Amino acid sequence: MSLKIQLGMAQVDEAILADLCRRYHVRELSLFGSAARDEMRPDSDVDLLVEFVPGAKVDLFEYSGLMLDLSKLIGRKEDLVSKKGLKPLIRASVLKEARLLYAARAPFSQRHY
């Protein structure tokens, strides 16, 4: 049985989202904005916060590919924001309301116990 993640008004298969994140070297993917606050309207986009695996070479082509694939998966327009690129003025509020959707597991050699 596959688990479903509520992404705004859409339900997304957790395994498919995880595969997509691994393909694009995503370390963490979080939901924020109206979808995270359960205030979405039919015309709302889905706000997603992304952090890439350290050292991953993510160029504009790959970033755009991730955006396109997420839009297809969700079935609506999304606004993908890099955690690194968050403006200081909104950073605290975005991080406070962010709901984690995916987190990559650290390789065994990098885990801290």
For each predicted feature, which ranges?
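Conserved histidines in hydrophobic membrane contexts and catalytic metal-binding motifs
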Residues: 31
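Catalytic core of pol beta-like nucleotidyltransferases
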Residues: 1-28, 36-42, 53-113
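Short hydrophobic/aromatic beta-strand micro-patches
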Residues: 49-51
